Amino acid sequence: MSSKTAIKDKWKLKKWFTIVAPKTFGEVVLGTTPAFDANQALNRKVETTLYDLTGDYSLVYVHLYFRVIGVEGDRLLTRFAGHELSRDYIRSLVRRKSSKIDAITDVTTKDGYVLRVKGLALTTYRAHRSQKTEIRKIIWNILSTRASETTFDEFVQDIVFGKLSNDIFQQAKKIYPLRKVEVEKTKLLKAPA
């Protein structure tokens, strides 16, 4: 009969690190994560809702993604990595006899960040192809010009809190009556070195 070897419990060796949101989101605590050392926790992705950061329940459908980029003691510092509206929310917006217009574009901010942004416009009635194309062009133009005029943090704030959606709505409703305009999804593709 062979003797049992002692098994070392690796979970007891791990330390817990606090994950903190960026300064633009008020450095709110996003959660905790276990790791042997802080460098092992780098590049981890954290998901939360805008409701968790602001306390405003009407923003519960906005999901935010952050990536761990640095260490400060036992705190892990993060950077905005993207956002997405919940699928339930988007499905509740789509109606019969109306058009859904998607516009996806890559934009570069003033400070060199590259993001992929997906805009969404919903019309009150069914629109013609030419009207959809014009609305899509307006979405692309506003997204690219606003990105080139603002820094990464300002651009993210405009997207997440709906200021950019409102500006697109005001311009695009001149082409065809719109019911709702949202920035459905963003993803950080490249950050400056």
UniProtKB/Swiss-Prot annotation:
Q: Which domain of life is it from?
A: Archaea
One cellular component term from this protein's GO annotations in UniProt: ribosome
Fetch the SMART domains from UniProt: Ribosomal_S3Ae (SM01397)
Q: Which GO terms describe its molecular function?
A: structural constituent of ribosome
Which Gene Ontology terms describe the biological processes this protein takes part in?
translation
Q: Does the keyword NAD apply?
A: no
Q: Which UniProt keywords apply?
A: Ribonucleoprotein, Ribosomal protein
Keyword Ribosomal protein listed? The answer is yes
Q: Name one Pfam family in it.
A: Ribosomal_S3Ae
User: PANTHER family, per this entry?
Assistant: 40S RIBOSOMAL PROTEIN S3A
Q: Which family does it belong to?
A: Belongs to the eukaryotic ribosomal protein eS1 family.
Q: What is the name listed in the Swiss-Prot or TrEMBL entry for this protein?
A: Small ribosomal subunit protein eS1
Q: Which organism is it from?
A: Sulfurisphaera tokodaii (strain DSM 16993 / JCM 10545 / NBRC 100140 / 7) (Sulfolobus tokodaii)
